């Protein structure tokens, strides 16, 4: 680990040194979803609404693998803190082997069952056709996305986060270029609409993976971390990762699944409500990436600091990250509340849709007053290695969230802006549960 960071205090400056590159990389990656939404918002309302369903459906599948990589990141962080650098490479290679196999299984299963599942879930024929087209062309990119997730886990776990910024810039530029060409039809190619968005995103993920491979070979100390040659597969190594990785995999999958169900509920309120929620989802991502940079930093620094033997410093570290997070997020919330129509125009140029989106945008932005504390504290729990407990805590929050959504959306069929108050419920419950667990100290002396 960087010697400037390897200390038990982790000042605000050192926290920022880790968080800022993660933030920039996540902002750049968020641009992929933003460009998909912004471009499709200029194709039509059906395409805009369908992309909400299709993107979240894809994310449910992607989060199975991404959740596994988060568990691997926690283990890598612990080994890095302990100074067992070659073991970080073993974790990387075995995680990569597992995710490549998993991607093949998920792609095959989705090809078989996606048409049936979409038919069950979507009531609009136009939305069904467009969403299925997106999913069919987006799935092949999952192989590249899973491999990239393991590279990200390695670089975040070893606190070499500057790499992420460069990768994200390359990925976003590629995605914008591919989408512009394929969605609208340039350089003699046909205008593919929502299908072009899916193909463009998959190609961008391939470019991202190529960048990581080239960068690792050229810049990373591969011998130090055991990346100079592929590790021989050992079932015992993978089994040793599973107690941590399984729970992060399940937790991330269930979390996004409930998000997907939320959009299915909204879809039954009509195509306009779905389009408004997709704008709110896209705008939410702007704040979300900032929050995730701090919460991801919290997870990896907690894991590293425990590996260094400074369990007594964990709570003070978490409090520093909380203060820094709220300072930045509250400033963003204020900007959203002052300029909601400006934010909405990023995603659509339909005047009536811009006006209709404002109430939902305001509710969504203010919900981060709860979500900020919830995510930072929750990722701190995961960073201790208590991933099974973290899963249970989020499960409690998600059950309450789904009950609330079912009542206000499915039964009462309230206005779409009121639907977004569900985010307050989720964030508040998660924050309370995570804080109680961290204060209890039951995570101390946990080995992974």
Describe each model-derived feature in a short phrase.
Residues 48-111, 145-159, 163-164, 276-338, ...:
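Small-residue-rich hydrophobic transmembrane alpha-helices
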Residues 1-19, 76-143, 189-246, 302-367, ...:
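Short alpha-helical transmembrane segments in multi-pass integral membrane proteins
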Residues 27, 31-49, 118-125, 181-192, ...:
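Helix-terminus/linker motif at the lipid-water interface of multi-pass membrane proteins
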Residues 69, 73, 138-157, 164-175, ...:
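Short runs within selected transmembrane alpha-helices of multi-pass transporters and secretion channels
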Residues 12-31, 35, 57-64, 101, ...:
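Residue-level signal for short hydrophobic patches within transmembrane helices
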Residues 29, 33-36, 40, 62-69, ...:
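Alpha-helical transmembrane segments and their lipid-water interface positions
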Residues 17-33, 137, 171, 204-208, ...:
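Transmembrane helical elements of multi-pass membrane transporters/channels
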Residues 22, 26, 38, 74, ...:
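Transmembrane alpha-helix boundary and packing residues in multipass membrane permease domains
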